[in-house]
Amino acid sequence: MNQSILSPFGNTAEERVLNAINAFKNGTGVLVLDDEDRENEGDLIFPAETITPEQMAKLIRYGSGIVCLCITDERCQQLDLPSMVEHNNSVNKTAFTVTIEAAKGVSTGVSAADRVTTIQTAIADNAVPTDLHRPGHVFPLRAVNGGVLTRRGHTEASVDLARLAGFKEAGVICEITNDDGTMARTPDIVEFAKKFGYSVLTIEDLVEYRLANNI
């Protein structure tokens, strides 16, 4: 990737990662780009612990509509969330579990507020499997242990960023799309970020930062 296009968001990987961590700490979303030879997409990511209905509405409006809750394997086990399929043969091994809905406090589960309620229910410290109905309108993703150092995916990036910002290891993500329904690529993501004031970083930035700081 031509790094100069990302210079408005920091001149180095460390600057961009630190800007993203600070944005997370302030409860603001960030845009994360993966490798051009992978999905070549940009996801808008929020800390699961602080996401608001207004932020969820923005994800739904400007994203693909598939809003995902990225959580650790430990959390998946706590909630008894099995994989969506027995044999995952997707290209990038995206680790969807069964979909979920909060058992209480929601109506149809589709609205922004309902999805936030489902997420809050799922990440609660004392959450148990019966707190959730299955299926639902939130798509959990199981992050691999080791984060982006093990798998260079948006799932792992969101969990890593949440941890680095001092939050529970859980992030909410959605792929950004263009007005015509096509997937937003790097130039589109940069313009989107400038329009709404988001930080931008790449998964490569996060890998480099973690390796350099041994975290």
Swiss-Prot record:
Name the keywords, alphabetized.
Lyase, Magnesium, Manganese, Metal-binding, Riboflavin biosynthesis
Q: What does the UniProt record say this protein does? A: Catalyzes the conversion of D-ribulose 5-phosphate to formate and 3,4-dihydroxy-2-butanone 4-phosphate.
- Pathway per the UniProt entry: Cofactor biosynthesis; riboflavin biosynthesis; 2-hydroxy-3-oxobutyl phosphate from D-ribulose 5-phosphate: step 1/1
Kindly list the positions annotated as binding D-ribulose 5-phosphate: R38, E39, D43, R151, R152, G153, H154, T155, E175
Where is Mg(2+) 2 annotated to bind? E39, H154
Family according to the record:
Belongs to the DHBP synthase family.
Required co-factor(s) are: Mg(2+); Mn(2+)
Q: Per its record, how is this protein called by name?
A: 3,4-dihydroxy-2-butanone 4-phosphate synthase
Keyword Disulfide bond carried by entry: no
Binding site residues for Mg(2+) 1: E39
Q: What catalytic activity is recorded?
A: D-ribulose 5-phosphate = (2S)-2-hydroxy-3-oxobutyl phosphate + formate + H(+)
Stored Pfam families: DHBP_synthase
Q: Where is this site: Essential for catalytic activity?
A: H137, E175
Return the GO cellular component terms, semicolon-separated: cytosol
A Gene Ontology MF term for this entry? Answer: manganese ion binding
Q: How is the cofactor bound?
A: Binds 2 divalent metal cations per subunit. Magnesium or manganese.
- Report the EC code(s) recorded for this entry: 4.1.99.12
| A biological-process GO annotation | riboflavin biosynthetic process
Q: How does it assemble?
A: Homodimer.
Instruction: Note whether Nucleotidyltransferase occurs among the keywords.
Output: no
